[in-house]
């Protein structure tokens, strides 16, 4: 039997910080200009009317209004102006 514990366990125990991705507001919710609607990697959700897309694929509202989700071959996020 070994008198010292093997080194395997001490090399484990790391994990990356969660990135908090996903929908930040639901369909039917009221949003203001600049509000973040979706945080994502790639385009799981696509921008439609009155929605902008940031460098990191974040979707955000371009106008004040109500969030609308539409699903065809892709899922589109739009904002109906008030």
Swiss-Prot record:
What UniProt keywords apply to this chain's record, in alphabetical order? Ribonucleoprotein, Ribosomal protein
Which protein are we looking at?
Answer: Large ribosomal subunit protein bL27
User: Which SUPFAM superfamilies does this chain map to?
Assistant: Ribosomal L27 protein-like
Say which family it is in: Belongs to the bacterial ribosomal protein bL27 family.
Kindly list the GO CC terms recorded for this protein. Answer: cytosolic large ribosomal subunit
List GO molecular-function terms, semicolon-separated.
structural constituent of ribosome
Region span, Disordered? 1-26
Q: Which domain of life is it from?
A: Bacteria
Among PANTHER family, the record links this protein to: LARGE RIBOSOMAL SUBUNIT PROTEIN BL27M (PTHR15893:SF0), RIBOSOMAL PROTEIN L27 (PTHR15893)
What InterPro entries is this protein classified in?
A: Ribosomal_bL27
Q: Which Pfam families match?
A: Ribosomal_L27 (PF01016)
**In Gene Ontology terms, what is a biological process of this protein?**
translation
Q: Which Gene3D superfamilies match?
A: 2.40.50.100
């Amino acid at each position: 039997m070994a008198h010292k514990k093997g080194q395997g366990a001490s090399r484990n125990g790391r994990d990356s910080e969660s990135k908090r991705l996903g929908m930040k507001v639901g369909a039917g919710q009221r949003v203001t200009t600049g509000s973040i609607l979706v945080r994502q990697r790639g385009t799981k959700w696509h921008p439609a009317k009155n929605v902008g897309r940031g460098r990191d694929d974040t979707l955000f509202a371009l106008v004040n209004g109500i969030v609308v989700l539409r699903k065809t071959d892709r899922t589109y996020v739009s904002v109906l102006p008030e």
